[in-house]
């Protein structure tokens, strides 16, 4: 074991919508946790409500961080959030900056998701289509909760409406008005890296024909799903990962926003079946070294 990724503070990994720690033997952060631990990092994947508002998830995460600080003796944590997990960790850092050394958004909808806007418009919650979609998401969340062998805490609440609104452009705009730390002042720009003693970083990917749809993604159904979802985008058409737009993902120092990775690839899903051009696990390993070099 090397110490190249041995950060000063623990790395706490927070999943997105319908996230989990480990489904039976299948981890959300496929290959990522092992790679970071091989480099000497203390890595703790956590669970919050799979389907709920970013604020509710954030309050759950605050409680979990307090446990981690108590158990490890650390003064702070480095938070890394994928998708809605990015909004969740931003909430925590805004509320309790004294507990957080850094916030890293990985494909986070920091200005909302055009996919969520499309679903809100075409599947209103009080229509039959909306209720069917709501029921399907509830069912998936329930099944995944039963199968998640990586979490053994109390049953976490589910609120599909709150979760959906938290991901729309309007919902995130309201969120950003309350928790603006690290946001760019101009569309497509970079935000301040250091706010209230917390360092902010982000990276994301885009669908790139000839790269993101090649390699092992040719047998990964999630890539097809992302390509279908990408058709719902207008403002960032051709500049998204299927669920989150390139510029919408920006937060703090933007490490990269155009990796040839779809929304699942960026956390090495599914089963490490990703396209050509970049190794998503390497991005996490390099970032841990970056945090270590910054004294975090």
Residue spans for each PLM region:
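Short boundary motifs at domain starts and secondary-structure transition points
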Residues: 1-5, 191-192
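Active-site catalytic motif of lipid deacylating hydrolases and related acyltransferases
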Residues: 3-77, 125, 131-133
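Serine-dependent carboxylesterase/thioesterase catalytic core
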Residues: 15, 43, 59-173
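Short aromatic-enriched loop/helix-cap "lid" or pocket-rim segments at secondary-structure transitions
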Residues: 24-26, 114-119, 211-216
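Glycine-rich, phosphate-binding/catalytic loops in enzymes
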Residues: 28-31, 96-98, 119-123, 219, ...
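A conserved mid-domain beta-alpha-beta active-site/ligand-binding segment of alpha/beta enzyme cores
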Residues: 151-207, 216
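C-terminal catalytic-base region of ester-bond hydrolases, centering on the histidine
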Residues: 187-296
